[in-house]
Amino acid sequence: MHKLFSWGGGKILEVETPNWEDWVPDLLVQFHQNVDHAQKSHKIGGRWENLYLDVADVGSARIPIRFARDCGKEKLGISSVILFDPLPGSKEKYPPFWFNFAEPGESTGLHDHADHAILSGVVYLSCEEKSGNLHFHMDGEV
């Protein structure tokens, strides 16, 4: 089952990843085993915002990323290529996927997932009840 929303000339697709019970526990273990050597971007409220790990260290991340690519094509008509490493010659030094780890009560600020991307996604691996709320805004609005 999925929900499709129109927003600012684009589309937002909400979908539950099938069989998440089969891969989320493995991905959480892989993340926690490797988080100490993650590359970090910047801090928000005292915590590291984006944690970048090599896909070889979090191999189960391929499952939701491939699912997002397939949903983009099937539900949105967007053909895309999955990148697990920065493009050669790119000024971007981090892989194009990352993890955010927040304790209860912590949150992130306004940011853009779609800079130079035709498809972007968010997967919640574990969160408290009534958390994980996404807020969207139009260009020029805050």
Regions found by a protein language model. Give the residues of each.
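Catalytic core of non-heme Fe(II) oxygenases with the double-stranded beta-helix
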Residues: K93-V142
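Non-heme Fe(II)/2-oxoglutarate
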Residues: M1-P88
